[in-house]
Structures are given as structure tokens and as C-alpha cells.
From Swiss-Prot:
Record field: compositional bias (Low complexity): 44-56
InterPro entries: bHLH_dom, bHLH_transcription_factors, HLH_DNA-bd_sf, Olig1_bHLH
Role, per record: Promotes formation and maturation of oligodendrocytes, especially within the brain. Cooperates with OLIG2 to establish the pMN domain of the embryonic neural tube.
GO MF annotation terms: DNA-binding transcription factor activity, RNA polymerase II-specific; E-box binding; protein dimerization activity
UniProt-annotated location(s): Nucleus
Pfam family, one: HLH
Known tissue expression: Expressed specifically in the brain, including the corpus callosum, hippocampal and cerebral white matter. Also detected in cells scattered in gray matter, most probably in oligodendrocytes.
BP-aspect Gene Ontology terms: axon development; neuron fate commitment; oligodendrocyte development; positive regulation of transcription by RNA polymerase II; sensory organ development
UniProt organism field: Rattus norvegicus (Rat)
Organism taxonomic ancestry: Eukaryota, Metazoa, Chordata, Craniata, Vertebrata
Protein name: Oligodendrocyte transcription factor 1
Length: 261
């Protein structure tokens, strides 16, 4: 009998907690709610009860989530003084690059013109050019090497001339006609400076100038009409082709003395 009454009280306990009927049950239910920290929602409606209970169970940051403010549209920013200075500096750099490129282009054009002029002088003495294709242009390195060899050849010819003039062979010695034109080696021991040295390759024949040097008399000098005893002379020999001025103090003896030093 006692067990049946106790079981009935246990089964009726939840009902008294949810819906009190007696004052004792109300105090017991209130004290139980205070112990567990649970607040009973007001019994107004089922929807308000469910929403309030859900809101009470959610954490505080989730309940108070602020909305992000809308971004305001930004218009075109006005140009500042720094932007203008940067644009001006960039324009100046572009102008400087154009000037540098123009100067470099001009330098390369001048270099190509100078190399072409050097090729015109070197090609008649280039054996590789005579054997190869005539329309093929020598490279810059090959042209400079040929010019170096040509200069060394002229130096050796001058050494031979010094030795020949130092021996003192008399009037039949080779003559050095100073006309300010390219040097042409006629034979070992004889170097001629003749105005006809610049011409087509077929006209550059050493034997031609050697025969002229042996057959013709020495260069004659006669004073100019308006000149005096110390005035320069006028040479009109067959080797010289056309009259040109020869200083009065620069005869064959003076040339021999200059090269014998």
C-alpha cells in the first residue's frame, strides 16, 4: 500500500512542476526552478513561448549580431600634387630615353660610314676578298685586322726605305715625293707617294710606278712666279701626274737626312 502511494507521488511530480494545483506544490516548484536557474516563460501563446525560449538558449553574441553598414559609393578622387609631379617626371624620363636612343643611332650610323670608308681602302689588298664572293661585305673585326696588317706592312716598308736612304745610293736612289696622299710600296727599298695611288684596283700596279721612277728624271723644282729664293717649289714630273707644291727646304737631301736619324 505504501509503495503504491509513493509511486503515485513520483508520477505526479512532473505535473505539479509544470502546472501547480496547490500552494505547497507551487512553493516546491518555484524552489526547484530557482535551484536549476530556469525561468518559466509566460503562458501567453505557444509561438511566443517557443521564440522566447529559443532566444534565451542562444548565446549573447548570436542574439546581438549587428548589421554591416552599407558601403557608400566613392566618386573619382581629385588629382593631387604628387600625381602631377609623378606624371611630369615620367614624361621627362621618356624624353631622355628618346634623346639617348637618337644619339646611339647617330653614333652607329657614323661608325658604319667609317667602316665602309675603311673597307674601300683595305679591299684591294685583301686576298680573302679576291677569293671570296665580291658582293660579300667584310665584317668589322675582319676590316680592323686587315687595317692593322696593312699599317704593319707600311711600317716595314718605311724601315726598308730608311736603310736604303742611309746607304746613299746617289741620284738613282728611290725618291719620296711628299704630296700628302696614300703610301704605295713599289718595291723593297722604294716607297712612292703619288697622287695616282687612289684609283681602281687595276691601276694600282707597283711595276708601273717603279718603271716611272727609274726612267724619268728626278723631280724638278722651279720657283713660283711670285716667289723668292726661299719660296716653295712647284713639281711637275711624270710620276706626280699634276703639279703640286714641294717645300723648298724639303729636297732629297733633307729627306735622306730625316730618315737616317
Amino acid at each position: 500500500m505504501y509503495y503504491a502511494v509513493s509511486q503515485a507521488r513520483v508520477n505526479a511530480a512532473p505535473a505539479t512542476m509544470l502546472r501547480p494545483q496547490r500552494p505547497g506544490d507551487v512553493q516546491l516548484g518555484a524552489s526547484l526552478y530557482e535551484l536549476v536557474g530556469y525561468r518559466q516563460p509566460p503562458i501567453s501563446s505557444s509561438s511566443s513561448t517557443s521564440s522566447s525560449s529559443t532566444a534565451s538558449l542562444l548565446p549573447k553574441p548570436a542574439r546581438e549580431k549587428p548589421e554591416a553598414p552599407l558601403a557608400e559609393p566613392r566618386g573619382p578622387a581629385p588629382e593631387s600634387g604628387g600625381a602631377r609631379a609623378d606624371a611630369k617626371e615620367e614624361q621627362q624620363q621618356q624624353q631622355l630615353r628618346r634623346k639617348i636612343n637618337s644619339r646611339e643611332r647617330k653614333r652607329m650610323q657614323d661608325l658604319n660610314l667609317a667602316m665602309d670608308a675603311l673597307r674601300e681602302v683595305i679591299l684591294p689588298y685583301s686576298a680573302a676578298h679576291c677569293q671570296g664572293a665580291p658582293g660579300r661585305k667584310l665584317s668589322k673585326i675582319a676590316t680592323l685586322l686587315l687595317a692593322r696588317n696593312y699599317i704593319l706592312l707600311l711600317g716595314s716598308s718605311l724601315q726598308e726605305l730608311r736603310r736604303a736612304l742611309g746607304d746613299g745610293a746617289g741620284p738613282a736612289a728611290p725618291r719620296l715625293l711628299l704630296a700628302g696622299l696614300p703610301l704605295l710600296a713599289a718595291a723593297p727599298g722604294s716607297v712612292l707617294l703619288a697622287p695616282g695611288a687612289v684609283g681602281p684596283p687595276e691601276t694600282l700596279r707597283p711595276t708601273k710606278y717603279l718603271s716611272l721612277a727609274l726612267d724619268e728624271p728626278p723631280c724638278g723644282q722651279f720657283a713660283l712666279p711670285a716667289g723668292g729664293a726661299g719660296s716653295p717649289g712647284l713639281c711637275s714630273c711624270a710620276v706626280c701626274k699634276f703639279p703640286h707644291l714641294v717645300p723648298a727646304g724639303l729636297g732629297l737631301a733633307a729627306v735622306q737626312a730625316q730618315f737616317s736619324k
